[in-house]
Amino acid sequence: MIKSEEASDRSVMTMDQLGGYYHDPRAHPPFSHPHAHSHPHQHTHTGHPYRAGNLLTGGNYQAMGGGESPTELIDEKPNIGYMELKHYMDATPTATPVSAAQHYSLSALHSMGTPPASSSPIPPYGVLMTAHSAGSASPQSNSKTPTDLPQDLQYASSSTSTAKVQPLQVQLQPLNHQYASTIKYCSNNTILSANDYQLLTSQEQAGQQQPQQLPAQQLQHSPGGGYMSRISTSPSQVISNAHGMPVLNYSSSSSSPAKSLNGSESSPPSQNHLENKVSGSAVVGTGGSSQQDAPSTPDTTKKSGTRRPEKPALSYINMIGHAIKESPTGKLTLSEIYAYLQKSYEFFRGPYVGWKNSVRHNLSLNECFKKLPKGMGVGKPGKGNYWTIDENSAHLFEDEGSLRRRPRGYRSKIKVKPYAGHANGYYASGYGDAGMDNGNYYASPAFASYDYSAAGATGVSPAGGQGFADPWNAHAAHSGSSSVGVGMGVGPLPQYTNISCLAAGGNVNGSATTPPLAHSALGMAPSASSSSSPLGAAATLQSDYAPTASLVAAGYSYATSAGSLDNGLRSISLQQLPGLSSIQHAQAQAQAQAHHHHHQHHASHPSHSHQGHGSMHQNHGTSSTTPPPSQSGGSHGIDHSPIDRKPAYLPPISPPPMMVALNGGGGYYEGLKYAN
């Protein structure tokens, strides 16, 4: 005989092909079942511990089916030993090895017992010790075990604790062997995890297969009449196996009734089998004596299959008001109001009575309803109260629509953004955002959210990592993370984090033929262009905006040097500029038409470079005063692009005059603003 562990490897194969293991009773002396059952118990519990990894290997241990043939699981060492579960399966060559990968059927699970270290990626622990459990489950444990099976059932040992429980017809379904094991022991109710899952899924399969296999399978699976659980009362309940985790398939009491669900799902025959499995899991905990068949049946009590009538469109206040107004006396008792509502609306006629609470709630909390004590009758004062409409509120009930109940979710539906402008982030945040106190009025919320000064200090804006996640950075998507790359040195431009990149970007355009949109990828290496050193510093400014800046710079012919500008312009194609704002597109178009204005712009934009970068900008662009591209004569295409004229505060940069900022941030500011 071979210890279950090794068996698991072969077993898994064996099981599948043989359709079940033949468990030699001799192998498990404890198992009394002689396999006298109509179909020999092919104890799927091969005793091979769950494959080393507790994998439910694809082995499909199918006890089902019946491989009446004695399948031998050949496992060298039954780690099952945890449970005393060392079952040695007769290694019968008959079993044809099934690929280990094949699913371990549930039965395999129980047999998983302790997984040898070998095959399974998953550690041995949590192995289902049930190897003998199939056989081992004591008849008693399965209350339903057929009498013929019980003798077999005696859980042999017990430590195995009916791990046998699942003959695992379920095994049919390929369980993720790796995951199954993992699942198994991940949950202390392990079975629930892998086994349950298998059971459930396999049950469905089994449910179809079982009816045929079931007779044999049940018997073979469980001495207890094919009850999967076949769970012996043995405390070990396989689950105890390595972890003491209730990994055991359904063996452990921990196995939750959910498993039993499986049973219930399976076809009636399989149901027994499954129930036992399930109950086994439940039972195991209880020594198997208390099989929980009930849990095995899914709870369907709440599902009547019919929906309640639609709730009236009127509010409770309105309906109560109608009732009172239509009464001859103008007042009604609570019970009369109930009667009116039931008569008038189908919704109130069903079994649901929660609406009565709503009626009482509305009567007592709304000032429009007034409570009148019942007058003195012949004898004592009347019991209860009348409800009437307060004269001061009568007008509320004259307009039918005023109290009409709005459909659920109505308010949320009307809470839509007033205009899409915000989406673009152009003006969304309002110029006075707290985030913009440094004078960067890029209305977009994106800017508002950044701490520019902090960003400047680091040379990377806080959002740098985000790389233009902001609404205004449409091209952010292109940029990847902040491509701050533009050769960005660490020149922090505290307030123009977004802009600093532009300067670098300008370099990129000038020096690199790379399309501006490549900016993110570029990392602006091109920033090395003639002005690159200063630009690099600028680029360093706000790494987070680098991509945008680079795009803008690239997209615009803002390259610091005119020559580089032209190159950059050429490199840029409109297709490449989609990420750029319309301005950028316009510029791109204009580029072909008028690079000159771009040069001007670039000059201006360089001027915008942050403090200390001004020098670099100065190179080309003392012309920073040049109007932003939108204004430049050559930039006819640019005109249409929206430009936020709001002045942006530029730290005193020697080259850039404030006017540039006013103009739109010297072109590249604009680009940034409208990047999206």
UniProtKB/Swiss-Prot annotation:
Q: Which InterPro entries match?
A: Fork_head_dom, Forkhead_box_regulator, TF_fork_head_CS_2, WH-like_DNA-bd_sf, WH_DNA-bd_sf
Q: Residue spans with biased composition (Polar residues)? A: 133-160, 257-273
* SUPFAM superfamilies membership: Winged helix' DNA-binding domain (SSF46785)
Please note every region of biased composition (Basic residues): 34-48, 594-611
Q: Which GO terms describe its molecular function?
A: DNA-binding transcription factor activity, RNA polymerase II-specific; RNA polymerase II cis-regulatory region sequence-specific DNA binding; sequence-specific DNA binding; transcription cis-regulatory region binding
Keyword set includes Nucleus: yes
Q: Specify one Pfam family.
A: Forkhead
Q: Does the keyword Transcription regulation apply?
A: yes
- GO terms (BP aspect): animal organ morphogenesis; mesodermal cell fate commitment; positive regulation of transcription by RNA polymerase II; regulation of transcription by RNA polymerase II; salivary gland morphogenesis
Which parts of this chain does the entry mark as a DNA-binding region?
Answer: 311-408
Composition bias (Basic and acidic residues) maps to 637-647
Q: Identify the domain of life.
A: Eukaryota
Provide the alphabetized UniProt keywords. Answer: Developmental protein, DNA-binding, Nucleus, Transcription, Transcription regulation
Q: Which GO terms describe its cellular component?
A: nucleus
* Cellular compartment(s): Nucleus
What protein is this chain from?
Forkhead box protein biniou
Q: What's the source species for this entry? A: Drosophila melanogaster (Fruit fly)
